[in-house]
């Protein structure tokens, strides 16, 4: 099924261990390269869906000069969107707790922008998943943030961690998207378009 990917040297440009884990689950050969410093600011005029697309394209642009003829570069960015506000990675522990308090008892949207780049073509797409949290107590938020230190996660949580077990009451869309890479979509896009 994934034989069309064998013609590429797949390069995942990501610092995210979750994206690495998800790509490894496909049982395909790939390399990981750490991201250089990429400016993750974005124009204020962008919608929630456009923000992670823009950032994933900026990440791809930072790597383009290192690509070879057979390279397939995968870059991604994930945000949490609630009431017109972006929740990216928290700045510190206090910010992480504030984010989880804002998400508590509400439904938010996790949006991941993915860019697939070869020397011949670039394809970008966004995937959205709705996630509903139970009302979280301060003790639950404190425990999670202190024990799991979710400073590298959009919205200050990992759905695959303790907070997901006790706090997520509903999920509509791709679970893997909430982890950081909607893995089904890149596979189908490479098969159809690259």
Task: Identify the residue ranges that each predicted region occupies.
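Generic structural signal for helix capping and beta-alpha/helix-loop junctions
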Residues: 40-42
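A short beta-strand-loop structural module common to alpha/beta enzyme folds
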Residues: 32-38
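Cofactor-binding loop segments of dinucleotide-utilizing enzymes, especially the Rossmann-like FAD-
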Residues: 15, 35, 119
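Anionic-ligand binding patches
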Residues: 3-6, 10-11, 46-192
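Surface-exposed, flexible loop/turn segments at secondary-structure boundaries
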Residues: 18, 38, 122
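N-terminal beta1-alpha1 ligand-phosphate binding loop
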Residues: 5-26
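Residue-level detector of anion-binding/catalytic polar loops
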Residues: 29
């Amino acid at each position: 099924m994934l034989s069309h990917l064998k013609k590429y040297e797949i390069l995942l440009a990501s610092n995210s261990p979750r994206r690495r884990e998800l790509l490894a689950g496909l049982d395909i050969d790939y390399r990981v390269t750490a991201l250089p410093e990429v400016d993750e600011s974005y124009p204020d005029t962008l919608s929630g869906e456009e923000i992670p697309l823009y950032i994933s394209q900026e990440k791809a642009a930072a790597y383009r000069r290192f690509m070879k003829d057979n390279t397939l570069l995968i870059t991604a960015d994930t945000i949490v969107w609630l009431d017109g506000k972006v929740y990216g990675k928290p700045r510190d522990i206090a910010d992480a707790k504030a984010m989880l308090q804002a998400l508590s008892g509400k439904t938010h949207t996790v949006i991941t922008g993915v860019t697939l780049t070869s020397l011949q073509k670039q394809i970008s797409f966004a995937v959205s998943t709705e996630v509903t949290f139970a009302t979280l107590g301060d003790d639950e938020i404190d425990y999670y943030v202190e024990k799991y230190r979710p400073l590298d996660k959009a919205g200050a949580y990992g759905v695959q961690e303790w907070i997901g077990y006790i706090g997520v009451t509903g999920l509509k869309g791709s679970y893997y998207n909430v982890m950081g890479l909607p893995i089904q979509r890149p596979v189908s896009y490479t098969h159809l378009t690259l």
